[in-house]
Amino acid sequence: MTVYLRKAEPSDLPDILAIIEDGRRTLQKSGIPQWQNGDGPNQEILAKDIDQQTCYILMIEDTLAGVGVLCSEIDPAHEAIFNGSWQPHSQTTYTAIHRVALKSSFQGQGLALVLLRSLVTAARLQGATDIRIDTHPQNFAMQHLIKKAGFVYQGDVILDVNDGERYAYQMILK
């Protein structure tokens, strides 16, 4: 099985939107309010991610199986952290991983971990040594995945969305 990460292209947008919608439905079925009621990734946001070349896709053979975005702009939500703090070695600049989703037909095969680790590698190849990610407090599957990938829980951040509390994680690389 051929598995690799590549930058998304404009022609990938319909497949990316389908994966995001698949993820939204999975979250809803699990009772997780993340990405619900108009919050979360949409066509405009994802098209901008692709245009800025920050959107990556996990390919399995010739099939787009997953998506994630590497943001190196300062995230206002990550500036204020509650119930903890960023690691002492934190940089003034960092890369945040956002909008991670895996097509449900590929779940249960360890590919979400491959996607997350591949995004970390891509961030490091771009020079990032401080990598951050956050997820909803009820998204236990993502929390497990984040920890398994080597991230450490640092505290809570608040996003400017409904039910915006998120658990924030960080990884410091050399």
Report residues per predicted region.
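Conserved acyl-donor/pantetheine-binding loop and adjacent beta-alpha core of acyl/acetyltransferases
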Residues: 69-99, 107
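Conserved beta-hairpin
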Residues: 53-70
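Conserved catalytic-core motifs of GNAT/GCN5-like acyltransferases
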Residues: 134-135, 147-167
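Conserved GNAT acetyl-CoA-binding A-motif
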Residues: 116, 123-135
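Conserved N-terminal entry element of GNAT/NAT acetyltransferase domains
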Residues: 1-14, 22, 174
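Conserved active-site alpha-helix within GNAT-family acetyltransferase domains
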Residues: 113, 125, 138-155
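Conserved GNAT-fold acetyl-CoA-binding loop/helix
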Residues: 25-45
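Conserved acetyl-CoA-binding loop-helix of GNAT-fold acetyltransferases
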Residues: 102, 108-121, 144-148
